[in-house]
Design a protein with these regions (language model features):
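Membrane-anchoring alpha-helices and their flanking helix-loop junctions
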Residues: 1-112, 116-119, 137-172, 176-199
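A short amphipathic helical element positioned immediately N-terminal to and/or at the very start
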Residues: 118-126
Length: 199
């Protein structure tokens, strides 16, 4: 396969992913919903984690685009093809996640918005499918255009996602939804899979 194919496919994966994010944000804005809650009304650990996560998520797409246009040494074709599959899977998971969450979807945690705990659909097998989708897209592009700066940026962002989940979101959801969320947390894994009733 020639480089034009890989470049076009990588750009399409990113366009679908970030386009979905932008469209959802605009749709929610038309309903007077503020999607981006990262760092808003926060203090302490929550503020630090969300601000750094916001920076990380801004850096990665820049690093991805620079990699697509500037990298000249590429991984073997089988790895790049695997990257395409992983990236497309990430797009699909993200679209389903955002659609299933409906108007309860936020980037970051809102202490003031009234939202519902969504536990059906894709959320019945993953408590954080949107974060999983980010990781899949990052991994997919990395497989197609591997370079060390992109790896560092992607890993840093993935670590910040994890810290956001563990240090901010899970604590917020437990406060907001109590035993309903605690029971859901016992049933469904953080990223993928369900647990047995015994757990």
């Amino acid at each position: 396969m020639n480089e034009t194919f890989y470049k076009t496919t990588a750009l399409a994966i990113l366009a679908v992913f970030y386009g979905c994010y932008l469209i959802k944000m605009l749709l929610q804005r038309s309903k007077s919903i503020r999607t981006d809650q990262m760092g808003v009304g926060k203090s302490g650990t929550a503020l630090r984690v969300e601000v750094v996560m916001k920076i990380a998520t801004a850096v990665v797409p820049i690093a991805e685009l620079l990699s697509i246009f500037l990298v000249t040494q590429y991984p073997p074709d089988p790895i790049r093809i695997a990257g395409i599959v992983i990236g497309i899977l990430g797009d699909i998971v993200f679209i389903i996640s955002v659609a299933t969450m409906r108007d309860s979807w936020r980037a970051g945690v809102s202490e003031t918005d009234r939202t519902e705990l969504v536990i059906d659909g894709i959320y019945s097998i993953s408590r954080n499918p949107a974060f999983l989708a980010f990781d899949l897209v990052y991994l997919g592009i990395l497989c197609m255009y591997f370079n060390w700066p992109l790896l560092a940026a992607s890993v840093f962002a993935a670590v910040m996602f994890h810290l956001q989940i563990v240090l901010v979101e899970e604590k917020f959801l437990l406060r907001a939804f109590g035993e309903e969320y605690a029971a859901y947390k016992r049933r469904v894994n953080r990223y993928l899979g369900r647990r047995s009733a015994a757990n």
